[in-house]
Curated annotation (Swiss-Prot):
Similarity comment: Belongs to the universal ribosomal protein uS8 family.
Entry keywords, A to Z: Ribonucleoprotein, Ribosomal protein, RNA-binding, rRNA-binding
The name this protein goes by in its record: Small ribosomal subunit protein uS8
Subunit structure: Part of the 30S ribosomal subunit. Contacts proteins S5 and S12.
Transmembrane segments: none
Gene name linked to the record: rpsH
Gene source species: Corynebacterium jeikeium (strain K411)
Task of the protein: One of the primary rRNA binding proteins, it binds directly to 16S rRNA central domain where it helps coordinate assembly of the platform of the 30S subunit.
GO MF, any single term: structural constituent of ribosome
Record NCBIfam families: PRK00136.1
Gene Ontology BP annotations: translation
GO cellular component, one term: ribonucleoprotein complex
Domain of life: Bacteria
Cross-referenced InterPro entries: Ribosomal_uS8 (IPR000630), Ribosomal_uS8_sf (IPR035987)
Amino acid sequence: MTMTDPIADMLSRVRNASNAFHESVSMPSSKIKANIAEILKEEGYIADYTVNDAKVGKTLDIELKYGPSRERSISGLRRVSKPGLRVYAKSNELPQVLGGLGVAIISTSHGLLTDREAQNKGVGGEVLAYVW
């Protein structure tokens, strides 16, 4: 059976693993999931990620990051643009997550960017998710 929304599945797996204080989480890999993991790593929400070859397809392993007293680095993840309701934003209308404390992941013609990078480049696109 095919998955309707693989990005929502990825975000749910990361959210559930973080809430259960798991060290890592594994999922089927794709280019867009690897790009989202790269943004999460650059922004400091996860420790690291690897893409491994499996017998069938590839797997994406994400190492979660916690503070010294086991506080979560990811407070929340929210899927914005869904298959049934796409959400687009112009470069001057890009959303700020928690007044700039969080990150919006935007799919643009320049690839996946954070809201700040898209604002600096002057491009808009599809708002995939909020992370805070």
